[in-house]
Amino acid sequence: MSKELKLYVHRLYEYDYNTGTIKRKNKICPRCGSFMAFHKWPVPRWHCGKCGHTEFVREAKR
């Protein structure tokens, strides 16, 4: 395996050494099942590059 591939996988998943479980860092798209990307600017949102689904983040009001 190349070094670039190993580094890329570490960006997608997180390993918990205490429990021995692997979990995904980003959300999963409800329409197609692929990873979603988080964008901060101009408005915070989750976007799927595969199908184009977008979820806007709402701030909690105090």
UniProtKB/Swiss-Prot annotation:
It comes from the Archaea. Its cofactor is Zn(2+). Transmembrane segments: none annotated. Zn(2+) binds at C29, C32, C48, C51. SMART domains: Ribosomal_S27. Keywords: Metal-binding, Ribonucleoprotein, Ribosomal protein, Zinc, Zinc-finger. Part of the 30S ribosomal subunit. Belongs to the eukaryotic ribosomal protein eS31 family. This is Small ribosomal subunit protein eS31. It comes from Hyperthermus butylicus (strain DSM 5456 / JCM 9403 / PLM1-5).
